[in-house]
Design a protein with these regions (language model features):
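Short Fe-S-cluster ligation motifs
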Residues: 100-114
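Flexible coil segments in periplasmic/lumen-exposed cytochrome c-class electron-transfer proteins
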Residues: 26, 44, 67, 103, ...
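Bacterial signal peptide processing site
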Residues: 22-24
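Conserved beta-strand positions that form and line the central face of beta-propeller blades
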Residues: 51, 95, 121-124
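Sequence/structural segment immediately N-terminal to covalent heme-attachment motifs in c-type
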Residues: 55-81, 86, 109
Length: 158
């Protein structure tokens, strides 16, 4: 009997809580606080340097690795071109050419690729990608092409 009473009493509270959890995009202040926290508190390895040489071959290797491992969510150009769900995720898939992503150091970008960013949709890939693959992707991110210039990922055009 006490469990039934507790369940009946808790049901309206649960309903009110769920109603209050409506998914709204974050405001400017909330976004600024979260971005500050990501850059200063959650993402590490700020001083780690990229050992991959900044050469056309290094950039091409990064583009190749990016097209295999990252393009499904970020598009071939890292700006979500042709990714049908990118703007419907919560939070939306960011443009990696944008100021927020480009303001990370190379070491921080490697850390993000290694460990992901929770609770966003960015998974970690430590153990799946080699350090050289990750560093080459970081190098590619520093040399992104114009939005849409590489077309859409084949997986969405076939």
């Amino acid at each position: 009997m006490p469990r039934v009473v507790l369940a009946i009493a808790a049901a309206p509270l649960l309903m009110l809580t769920l109603i209050g959890c409506k998914a709204n995009p974050p405001g400017k202040a909330e976004t600024a606080v979260v971005n500050w926290a990501k850059h200063k508190m959650f993402v590490h390895n700020k001083k780690e340097k990229n050992p991959i040489q900044n050469t056309p071959a290094g950039i091409a290797d990064g583009r190749e690795a990016f097209s295999h491992y990252c393009a499904a969510c970020h598009g071939l150009d890292a700006q979500s071109t042709g990714v049908p769900f990118a703007d419907r995720m919560s939070p939306p898939v960011p443009s990696l050419a944008g100021m927020d992503a480009q303001s990370y150091s190379d070491g921080q970008l490697k850390w993000i690729i290694d460990f992901g960013i929770w609770p966003s949709g960015m998974p970690g890939s430590k153990g799946m990608l080699s350090d050289d693959e990750i560093w080459s992707i970081v190098l590619y991110l520093r040399h992104l092409p114009p939005a849409g210039s590489l077309g859409e990922p084949q997986m969405y055009t076939q």
